[in-house]
């Protein structure tokens, strides 16, 4: 039996990719499309229900799983809608504030909700590998990260960089917010040992590149993940949607739960 998918932000780059895969892969079916009022008219003629909010489409798609790659304010509206209806929701949006994340955790007690800053399998394998590497190398190695994205990305550092940074900080027994440095300028003195640098580069149409540097006495180790297309993230989101069908409300699920 195929998993029915509602795509929120259907006119966006990720939305279009997810819609195409959901409509063409036998394991999935397209059950609804959602976009803002100024863009929803372009969805006219679709073979599934269309609306300018997830709340408007959910009653027409019982049992469907919504996938939302939009903006924090829109994704929160989607989460509130499924909390009221009982549908499941996969969120790939980044840039949430701490207060918004807290609300997601509360809403996840009422409906199955899955959130990840990066849906690629490779990045989530890195989250398992990097802590082991960090502990093996020890405190003699400084940790820095550089992330590259296209010139239309709105948040910085990327959600993926922050997720990887949290994995690295936890391995050192730190809280990322206490040790993160995202800008250096002027006479700032020596680099503190308890620090993880995360620098962002924006330009062109780069899908996403994250490189972690371990710099120690006389040597440097570089670990890089490079996304070649958005299909990587779309496939991961669809995989999460299929997995979420069998889950119950109670916690905000993530990639670690699925793996």
UniProtKB/Swiss-Prot annotation:
Pathway of action:
Amino-acid biosynthesis; L-lysine biosynthesis via DAP pathway; (S)-tetrahydrodipicolinate from L-aspartate: step 4/4
Catalytic residues in the record? 149 (proton donor/acceptor), 153 (proton donor)
Which Enzyme Commission number(s) are listed? 1.17.1.8
Quote the cellular component terms of the Gene Ontology held in the record: cytosol
Query: Which residues does the annotation say bind NADP(+)?
Result: 37
Q: Please provide an example of a Pfam family that matches this protein in its UniProt record.
A: DapB_C
Provide the protein name. Answer: 4-hydroxy-tetrahydrodipicolinate reductase
Provenance organism: Desulfovibrio desulfuricans (strain ATCC 27774 / DSM 6949 / MB)
Q: What is the lineage of its organism?
A: Bacteria, Pseudomonadati, Thermodesulfobacteriota, Desulfovibrionia, Desulfovibrionales
- Whichever gene encodes this chain, its name is dapB
